[in-house]
Structure formats: structure tokens, C-alpha cells
Amino acid sequence: MQRLYPNVVWRKDKTQKKVYLTFDDGPIPECTPQILDILKAYGVKASFFMVGENAVRYGQLLARIREEGHAIGNHTYHHLRGWKCGVDAYVEDVEKASKVLETKLFRPPHGRMGGRQKKALLERGYTICLWDVLTHDYNSRYTVEHMMRVVRKYVRNGSIITCHDSLKSKDRILELLPQMIAYLRSEGYEFATL
């Protein structure tokens, strides 16, 4: 996959023992506040790739995320699937979200978009960020124990770890997050934002 997207951030500095927790799809009142509470309790900052329409609908959560010092990324305005629309429509949706979120940090929904869409966003100054560790917290077939095995096996210096603040992930992420933070700290990792 990384060969298909060479101008995309998959992982940060491999020489530093830092990891980057990221959350996609929010903010939503059903779980974003609880995630923020957990992060605050552990003194961890994360990066939130937000859907623009959610950020507008739940502006108080966008404000809280900003106030608490987390990084903000763009996840399109309507959670658009890039492979199902043209370049102009996709870029327009990203730009609409950018006006709300005030960021040039971008992650495509589902981690997928077309090459022409990627090129157009890079030309407009966006930094496109994917991940090297996906927790699968949105998938009810996976247990929290399985997700922790993934974290233990694949996290390394500079890892970008993708989680979700969504209805699909709610129960699993709220159980996983404290365990994951405690484990990563025990391994000597620091947490940073993108």
C-alpha cells in the first residue's frame, strides 16, 4: 500500500520512541466526550480526523478538542468515499470541511482515494496522513484482546495508530483505550500529535 501512496505520511520519525494516537469519524456525543475524558485522565494528546458535518453539528466537541490541545485533521465533510466520486466533488468536500476545521492535515475515509484526488489535494497544500497500525475497533468481529495483540505486535517507533470515535467502535474503544495507553507507556512510548 505504501508504494501506491509514496507522498503520504504512514509513520513518523522512526528514531524517536513516540506514537501517535488518532481518531477518525467523530466527533459524536455518544463517545467522543468519554474518549476525551480518558485522554485527559492519562495526560495524553491525540489527533482527531473529523467529519466536517459532525464538527458543525457538535461544535461544542470541536471546541473542547481544540481547548484540550489535541490536533485536528480533516476527514472530508460528508465522510465521502473517494472511489465513488469525481476529483472535483471530492476536493470540494474536503475544502468545505477545511473551512470548518481550519486544518490542512487530511485523512481519506477508509484510507482510500484515487490518485488524481491525492494529487489535487497535495497541490493544494494538504498533508495526507494514513497509518501503520489499525486497531479495527469499528469491527464487532474483533475483541479488545485481539486489538491489544495487534498493538503489541505492530506498534513501533513513530507508529500512527488509528482508532475511531464512532457508534460502531464505541464500546470497544472505550475499553481498549486505557489498556492501550497503559501498555504503550509501560513499553516506554511517549504520545504526540500529528
Where are the model-predicted features located?
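N-terminal pre-catalytic segment of deacetylase/amide-hydrolase enzymes
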Residues: M1-T22, P27-Y42, R57-Q60, Q179-L194
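Hydrophobic alpha-helical transmembrane segments of integral membrane proteins
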Residues: Q2, L105, L174-E175
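Catalytic grooves of carbohydrate-active enzymes
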Residues: R152-L194
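Metal-dependent polysaccharide deacetylase catalytic core of the NodB/CE4 family, i.e.
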Residues: K18-V19, P29, K40-K168
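Charged catalytic carboxylate motif
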Residues: Q34, D93, L176
